[in-house]
Every structure is written in C-alpha cells, then in structure tokens.
Amino acid sequence: MNRQSWLLNLSLLKTHPAFRAVFLARFISIVSLGLLGVAVPVQIQMMTHSTWQVGLSVTLTGGAMFIGLMVGGVLADRYERKKVILLARGTCGIGFIGLCVNALLPEPSLLAIYLLGLWDGFFASLGVTALLAATPALVGRENLMQAGAITMLTVRLGSVISPMLGGILLASGGVAWNYGLAAAGTFITLLPLLTLPRLPVPPQPRENPFIALLAAFRFLLASPLIGGIALLGGLVTMASAVRVLYPALAMSWQMSAAQIGLLYAAIPLGAAIGALTSGQLAHSVRPGLIMLVSTVGSFLAVGLFAIMPIWIAGVICLALFGWLSAISSLLQYTLLQTQTPENMLGRMNGLWTAQNVTGDAIGAALLGGLGAMMTPVASASVSGFGLVIIGLLLLLVLGELRRFRQTPPVSDAG
C-alpha cells in the first residue's frame, strides 16, 4: 500500500486471485440477498395487509441468522472452511428456489415463506462466518485492513444497487423474478468460490459444540482488548438504529419524499468515503486510540443530527457518522482478525457479527421506547449524547485497547 496516499489501494484484487474470487462472490451474493430483502416484505404485505406479519418475518429471519452465526463459528473452527462456505451457499440457494416456486403457485403459502426465511437466514449467516474466518489465510494478516475496506465498499455498493434492481423487477415481473434471480445469483457465486484453495483449520481437540462456544465467550470476557473491540462494535451498531426516527424527523423538517431518501443514503455514503480514504489507516501505530476517538466522534454526530435547524445539516451529520463509524469498524475488524488465535477465528467472527445483528435490534427497541416518552428530536439527541458519555467512560476504562501499539504492516499488495 502506498504510504503517501490516503486513498484505498485496490491492487489486492490483482495480486490475490483467491480474494478476487471472494470479492466477486460477495458482490453477487449481496445483490441476490438485496433482491430477496425487497421481495419478502412486499409479498407478505400483499398477502396479509399486515405490517405485524411483515415484522414477524424480519424477526424470525434475524433469529435464524443469530443461530447461524453461532453454529457457523463452531463449524468454521472444526471443519475445512471452504467446504463449509460451499455447503452454506448451495443450501441457501435451494431455499431461494423454494421461495420462487411458492410465489408461482396460484395461492402462495405464508407458512412456507416464514419457514424458508428461517432456512435462508440460518445458512446465509453460517457461510458468512466461515468466509470471515478464512480471510486472513487468503490475503495475509498484513493486508487485512485493505481487504476489510474493499469488502466494505462492496457491501455499500451492492446495498445501493440491489434495492433499486429489486424495485424494478417487482414493478415489471412480480416477486417470482426476484426470488428466481436471487437463486441464480447464489448458485453463480459457487463458481468463483470453487477456485479457492483448501482452507484447513488448526488441529484441536474435539469437544461438545456448546463447550466450544462457551470457550469463545470466556476468551472474549478474559481479553480486555478483544472484549473492548466487541463492546465498541455493539455500541456503534446501536447508534446506527437512529434511522427508525427518520420518518418522524423528516416531518419536523418538512422534507419531501425525495429529500427523505437523502437521510437513508447519508450514512452509507459517509461509510463509503471512509473506506475509500482508509489508505493510511493500516499504518497507524495506535489503532486502539483511533478506534475509541472515532467511535466517540460518531456518537457525537448522532447527538447533533436531530437538533440541526435545517435538514441539510442533519444529512451532513449522518454522513459524518458514516465516515467515523467506518473508520472504527475497519479497525475493529482488523484488530479482531490479527489478535485472535487461528483456532478461534470462526467463533470470534461469529460472535462479532452477531453483536452487529443484536446491537441494531436493541438500539431500535431503545429508540422506540424513548419515542414513546419524548419527541423524536429529543429521542435521537438523548441516545446520541448518552452514547457519547458511555464512549468517554470507555476511553478511560479500556486502557489496554487505548494503549495498544502495533508495528505498521509491510503489504505486498502494491
């Protein structure tokens, strides 16, 4: 990586064929899952005219994802990771085919949608954990920051493209097209993934899966460094749940429908800028301190967001949150991968990803509770400034993370 450039170096895609294969598979997978994410709520709403039923499907899928992350972490530390990745992707695609067939029936089954949502949520997250655990072996630990930034860009780009494509397909061909293309995309991802090298796990004693997962929890709690990283990740994810207040805040700012879309686009845009300008981040000597400061700064941006007098200033605050949270997330990912023993990478990646899922749900619930007691402006500000106070306390308490120093890696990617 060029030490003189703040811009992200994409040369890793050229020099590491295995990572390039993962990049292609991940992008296609994100677009496929995005098509699914648009189709399922629309189909359930059309069938039931009940927002509660739509919410139930999201909750069930989220629960299945959480279990899949836990199980996937154990499997990724026990079995050859390439096999786990391929099995999870292929099985997930079968579920998409089931949704497509169900949508083509004269009377689609609501129960089938719920059950297949559980199926796909479980196997999709199972494969994600194994892929995360395999990344250090694919790119080398010295290139993890660069790989993480490229992955973040992939996710953001795919998350923008897939809802737009999904909406066009719904308008022109109905939900069956979304499901069918999602299934096709998922099976297409198997082609680049088949080119991956074998990804064996370190030898370790066989033990009960629950005991293996408990060992990961003990490691997390016993390590001030890894535990602090996981805690910060959960808090940042909680802060991002402020999006549940966008519709109410948009009314107070008297925003048009088109302008409301800018609120939803601001955080992904800021995160993309953060990833694009992360070229020097891997060479920081004190990544823990930068992580803590950027996290507190992101909370401050959320606190200021709602009290801005005009909506444009609010959008700028959200973009700032996206940028700072991207810096924090990239450092979390890199330190987690480099400081976790190889034989625990699967389980720790599963726990770290799971806290993102649960943190978002907890944040949304807390904001909903605050919204019942105070105005949307007050709810967003109280949550943001409350997290600032917690962040400042953690800046003092997490001494090992704050003082952590590393030797800047010498990348062979560029």
Swiss-Prot record:
Residues in the Periplasmic compartment per record: 43-55, 105-109, 178, 240-256, 308-313, 378
TM stretches of this protein: 22-42, 56-76, 84-104, 110-130, 157-177, 179-199, 219-239, 257-277, 288-307, 314-336, 357-377, 379-399
Keyword Transport in annotation: yes
Domain of life: Bacteria
PROSITE patterns: MFS
CDD domains in UniProt: MFS_MefA_like
Protein's membrane topology: Multi-pass membrane protein
Cellular location(s): Cell inner membrane
GO terms of molecular function: enterobactin transmembrane transporter activity
Main location: membrane
GO cellular component: plasma membrane
Cytoplasmic side: 1-21, 77-83, 131-156, 200-218, 278-287, 337-356, 400-414
Protein keywords: Cell inner membrane, Cell membrane, Membrane, Transmembrane, Transmembrane helix, Transport
Family stated for the protein in its record: Belongs to the major facilitator superfamily. EntS (TC 2.A.1.38) family.
Role of this protein: Component of an export pathway for enterobactin.
Record-given protein name: Enterobactin exporter EntS
Gene coding for it: entS
